[in-house]
C-alpha cells in the first residue's frame, strides 16, 4: 500500500468526497460524474477576473473539446487549406456566441467547453485533450477568452505562437494567421496594429493539428514591443 492511500483510509466520508471531486476520482454520489484532473497543465478557474502573467501572456481560456479533423501529416497546412478548415461551420454560434463553462455544443458529436487557467505561458492543448480522454491527433481546437481593457489602446499588436497552424480573431475580425507545419514559438507572428477597445474584447482562436504535440501562446504588445499586462481576462 502506498503512502498516498494510507492517509486516506482514516479520512471522513465528506473529505473523501471532496478529494474525489478534486482529483477526478469517482465521487460516490449516484449519477454524478467527476471531472478528470487536468493538472499539472491546467487549473479550474476561480471566481473573478485574472491578469496576464508578467510577460503579458493570456492564461485564462475557454477550451472546446477537440473536433475530429483527420490529417496524417501537417505538411498540407497551406494558408488555403487552413483557412477553409478553420472557417468551416462546425457548431452553432461558432463565431458569434460567448460560450459558458460546461456548455455542450452540437458538432458532429457533442463537445463541452471548459474554463481553465493554464499553469504555463503556453496553453498545452495536447495535455488538455489527453486528460479528458479525447483525440489528440488529427483535430481542431477552439479557444475563447475576454480581454477587459481599462482604456482604449491603439497601435497594439497581438502576438501568437502555435503548434501547428492557427487563425485568431479579435472582436470578430481575423487578426493573425499561422500557416504550414510549425512548432510553437512565442511571438512567432505579430498582427498588424490593432486597437483594444475600452472594456470587453473577445478573442477567438482555432488551432489545427495532425500528428504531434499541440499548444499555443497569445499576448499583446504595445507600439514599443513591451508586453501589455494592465488588462484583465475572464471567460464570462
Predicted regions and their residues:
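Beta-strand-rich ligand-recognition modules
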Residues: 167-219
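Aromatic-lined ligand-binding clefts that engage carbohydrates, nucleic acids, or primary amines
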Residues: 154-169, 203
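C-terminal segment of classical bacterial N-terminal signal peptides
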Residues: 19-28
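Non-cytosolic beta-sheet module surface loops
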Residues: 149, 158-162, 207-209
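Extracellular and analogous surface-interaction loops
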Residues: 143-156, 193-198
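Extracellular beta-rich ligand/substrate-recognition surface
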Residues: 130-141, 179-185
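Accessory carbohydrate-binding/adhesion or oligomerization-edge regions at the termini
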Residues: 28-125, 205-236
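Bacterial N-terminal signal peptides that target proteins for export
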Residues: 2-15
